[in-house]
UniProtKB/Swiss-Prot annotation:
<dbReference type="InterPro" id="IPR012162">
    <property type="entry name" value="PNPase"/>
</dbReference>
<dbReference type="Pfam" id="PF03726">
    <property type="entry name" value="PNPase"/>
</dbReference>
<keyword id="KW-0479">Metal-binding</keyword>
<dbReference type="InterPro" id="IPR036612">
    <property type="entry name" value="KH_dom_type_1_sf"/>
</dbReference>
<dbReference type="Pfam" id="PF03725">
    <property type="entry name" value="RNase_PH_C"/>
</dbReference>
<dbReference type="GO" id="GO:0000287">
    <property type="term" value="F:magnesium ion binding"/>
</dbReference>
<dbReference type="GO" id="GO:0006396">
    <property type="term" value="P:RNA processing"/>
</dbReference>
<protein>
    <recommendedName>
        <fullName>Polyribonucleotide nucleotidyltransferase</fullName>
        <ecNumber>2.7.7.8</ecNumber>
    </recommendedName>
</protein>
<dbReference type="InterPro" id="IPR036456">
    <property type="entry name" value="PNPase_PH_RNA-bd_sf"/>
</dbReference>
<feature type="binding site">
    <location>
        <position position="495"/>
    </location>
    <ligand>
        <name>Mg(2+)</name>
    </ligand>
</feature>
<dbReference type="InterPro" id="IPR001247">
    <property type="entry name" value="ExoRNase_PH_dom1"/>
</dbReference>
<keyword id="KW-0694">RNA-binding</keyword>
<dbReference type="InterPro" id="IPR015847">
    <property type="entry name" value="ExoRNase_PH_dom2"/>
</dbReference>
<keyword id="KW-0808">Transferase</keyword>
<dbReference type="InterPro" id="IPR036345">
    <property type="entry name" value="ExoRNase_PH_dom2_sf"/>
</dbReference>
<feature type="domain" description="KH">
    <location>
        <begin position="556"/>
        <end position="615"/>
    </location>
</feature>
<keyword id="KW-0460">Magnesium</keyword>
Amino acid sequence: MKIFREVFELGNKEIVLETGGMARQADGSVTVSCGNNVVLVTTVVKKSVAAGADFFPLSVHYLEKTYAAGKIPGGFLRREGRPSEEQILISRLIDRSIRPSFPDGFFNEIQIVATVLSYDGSFSPDMLALIGASASLAISGAPYDDIIAGVRVGYTNGKYILNPNKEELKESDLDLVVSGTDDAILMVESEANSLPESVMLGGILYAHKHLKTIINSISKLAKVSSKPRIEYTIYQINKLLKSQIKSHFFGEIKNAYTIPSKQERNIKLNELRKNVLEHIFTSDVDGNEYSEKEVLEAFHDIEKDLVRSNILEGKPRIDGRCTETIRPINVKIGVLPGVHGSALFTRGETQALVVTTLGSDRDAQLVESLDGIEKSRYMLHYNFPPYSVGECGMVGMAPKRREIGHANLAKRATQAVFPNEEAYPYVVRIVSEILESNGSSSMATVCGSSLSMMDAGVPIAEPVAGIAMGLIKDGAKYAVLSDILGDEDHLGDMDFKVAGTRYGVTALQMDIKIKGISREILEQAFEQARTGRLHILGIMNEVIREHKESVSDVAPQIHIMNVNPAKIKDVVGRGGSVVKGIVEKTGAQIDTSDSGEVKIFAKDKRSLDLAKSMVEEIVAEVEEGQIYKGKIVKLLDSGAFVNLLGSQDGYLPFSEIEQAGMKTNSLVEGQGLEVLVQNIDRGGRVKLSLVAR
């Protein structure tokens, strides 16, 4: 068993790549270690293409094992279940990073599995998994010539931090992940505290220059340990077939792409596809030599060439816009009467109905990870039903990876403006229902989430808007597109989503399909995105600029009281008897803490006010010189104990009763008396006198 190792430094941390010791039956197997963190990444490449395959079946699975952190899983079975959302997001991040490095037309199935074997909690293992995925591919024999790498960058006190640990990330205004090759940026994912575009671009370029060290180490490992290159075929468009279709149908295809409506355009294009298939299969020019798949691929290639050339030649885009024009926007809030907050955001043929629901601390999401169980006060869920694109399909199933990814992007975009628990004690859940989609539904979700929260009275720091940018590039000619359509995303070279406030960027996601994206192009894309974002914010601000001062009448009410910590036991009572009684009588939820905080959560104001008054009565302090209506709770030989407030009793001597002209033998337990607090000694003992009738 021969083991090969490569060692390099990244951000003052030593990282070790090793192959040959584990999982040797996989085509590629690499362990990536940093301190006590170890990730095993395997790659398996199928040597033949599945019959009828017309896409690249790459799958990436990032898995965390609880034993890596010295823990036993929860649940009845005490074993790991399906991957968490965080694991799915890391799988997507790795997939998006490596997918562009494969040649077009390569359809062999590849499966990558990254397994966290050891974890010390100092930093997320996601970058180790990404580096390991690239290394295992490089030695697997797959056609993976453009080796990629990825790094995380933070930004604190005006300085970029390479490969920050978790403590550094907590203080950072930026969490940026960049992956790419030696000479190209391929993927960017980030969250930021409203940072200027110049800082975001600087972070991307700073990250890219540090990829070379990792790529060199992976290349060295591949040179000494790589398997022979597999034999494979590349699917290519039949040029003769493409020429045939173009000569007969190009004019009609061209006319179809002047129809601005997506539905009408698709009807025309589907009709053309049928006509093309009929023409090819009934013509005398060897039509039977071609499959339906080949014909439709050639047709699609003509569409792609047409859309791209039109844009590069300065002609109108598919829907008639120029490169910088934003589609018409319509904003409505409060569209659903029975919810806590709602907004309907429509941009062209993309529409998101976004609903905000307020809850108590008990509604917070509990997220289990290698770090333990964490509580999330802010949840955002994204649903993409098939009717949003005019299709039939599965409904009511678990969210797909794409839905989880879009929800996460929208959450990260609005996280920077979400209030902390001290300022806003509610738990918030946002649901985005995509009702129509023709590009950039995730950015519509960002805009709708901001509007919906303001409608619900959530005190967000600033409104947030998002926009998706695109790129068409051919040699030195290029065009940056604002607010891209679905077809422009599919046929273009870049998907660049930017969200932020009027002050700066809060989230960024970029996927680039080609090499050669210069700094000049990135600067233009950032500037166009900023202009577009401010335009969208302006329209949103015309409808609602700041959060509503109060929550909806149908929304729950929260009140927080800070009382003497010694009184908490009185609020709770023996075995929780007192607090249970308040809950049963008012219907409110009551949470207490040893610090003296009492949090009341009620379905309406009446319930809240009643619970509040009951708690206030329990925790109220008696004062000297004040008169109280009390009740005798115990009779002694020399006097009576009278309950004043909650659990506070005072002692009433018989001499005081007689002095007030009342006979002591007439007193019974449970009898009401009006008493005056004469004094309270240092021990807290209360002496009373009877108020004469």
